[in-house]
Structures are given as C-alpha cells and as structure tokens.
C-alpha cells in the first residue's frame, strides 16, 4: 500500500525534520511504500520520496492551527495514497510501528489528559468557537494532535470539515483553545475514530523513566523548549 506522511516544519522546527524521516524509514510501517509531504516556508533539499509544499511564514500558532487548511490545499496529491498519517515534526519513533495503526480514522489518546476525569479535560469552552464542547458533551477519550491519520478518504473528510471551521473561526477573530487539537476533539466527539491508539503512540518523553506510567513508548513527543522554538 501507498502511505503518505504529513509533516509541518516552520521556523526553528525545521531542525527536527531529518531525525523524524530517518525514524520513519527505520521503524514505521515497514513493507509499505512510504512517501512524505513536508509543509514549510524554508527552501530545503529533500530526497526523491519527499514532496515540499511551500506555506507562508506566520507566527505561532498559525502553522499548527491551519494544518488542515494546508492538507486541503494538497488534496489532489494526498488522494493518490491509500493512507496518510500526520506526525508533529518534533516526534521520535523508538519502537517499531506496524500494521496495527492501519484503520479508517486513527486518533491517539493524549498522554496526560487521558487520565483526567472528562469534565476536567481542556476542551474548548468558548461558545463563539466551532470547536466548542459544552459541559456534558465531552467525549469518552481526549486525543492528542501529535499523531493521527487513516485512510485518505476518511482523513481528508475530517480535514475539509476542520479547515472550514478554522477559517470561519478566524473570520470571527476566534482561535480555539488548543488550536487544531481542540478542533479535532470536537469533530471526534461527533465522528468517533475507528481506531483509538493508546498514549504509547504519543508518549511524553519526560515519562520515559517513570516506572509507574502505564504504557510503553512507541512514538514519543520530544521534550523541548517551546518558547525558544517559537520565538
């Protein structure tokens, strides 16, 4: 099968690209044809199996908020693939990830908020946002934005809805609390994923040596200085 990896690397986040692609080549869905689609404002050289899509250089948090808008812009290209998976560029793969992640719509449980009572999870509570989740409408699970995907058809159906919602929010001077993650969680309450991966697939690096954490790491969110990277 043909698998496309979606990644965004703006500003200083470009430093993580090479490591992530090396990890994917070594440990992600081996045995399938893997290609990449990198969204960046940088002028970069890549291997033949990586396509670069140029985006505007915008301040944080526009590059993450508008990720689904970027995907929709490349819909014709993305639609050539059987499955597509989005990785935050500052992720690492520490254990082999195989066909267990193949499903129509795949989301990953948040490495922290999954353990909170659902009424304490930080859904968007602003009624002016299309990501709004009223008290009492919380989902059974809360999902992280760092790794998700699925069949191209189902994933792009979600992307088109969320791109439209983000655009409408921006037209009303509204930004969802956790940007794309808030928008995605609202969508997944109404359209549950066909596969909910455990926090093993979006594992906080600072938990690597915590013997009491109930999951083992497969894909990790690297510990970093967010303020420095976004400056």
Q: What is each stretch, according to the model?
A:
Residues 1-66, 73-80, 224:
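N-terminal anchoring/stem segment of glycosyltransferases
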Residues 36-45, 89-97, 201-202:
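Short, polar loop motifs at secondary-structure junctions
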């Amino acid at each position: 099968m043909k698998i496309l990896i979606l990644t965004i690397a703006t500003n200083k986040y470009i430093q993580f690209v090479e490591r992530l692609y090396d990890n994917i080549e070594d440990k992600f869905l081996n045995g399938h044809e893997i290609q990449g689609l990198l969204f960046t404002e940088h002028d970069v050289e890549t291997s033949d199996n990586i396509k670069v899509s140029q985006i505007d250089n915008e301040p944080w948090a526009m590059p993450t908020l508008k990720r689904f808008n970027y995907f929709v812009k490349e819909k014709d290209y993305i639609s050539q693939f059987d499955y597509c998976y989005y990785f935050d560029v500052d992720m690492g793969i520490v254990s082999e990830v195989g066909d267990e992640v193949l499903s129509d719509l795949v989301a990953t449980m948040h490495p922290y908020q999954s353990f909170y009572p659902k009424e304490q999870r930080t859904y968007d509570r602003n009624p002016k946002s299309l990501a709004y989740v009223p008290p009492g409408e919380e989902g059974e699970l809360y999902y992280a934005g760092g790794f998700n995907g699925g069949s191209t058809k189902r994933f792009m159906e979600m992307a088109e809805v969320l791109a439209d919602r983000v655009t409408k929010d921006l037209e009303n001077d509204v930004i969802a609390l956790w940007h794309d993650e808030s928008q995605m969680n609202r969508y997944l309450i109404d359209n549950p994923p066909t596969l909910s991966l455990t926090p093993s697939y979006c594992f906080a690096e600072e938990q690597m040596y915590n013997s009491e954490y109930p999951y083992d790491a497969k894909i990790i969110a690297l510990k970093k200085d967010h303020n420095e990277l976004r400056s």
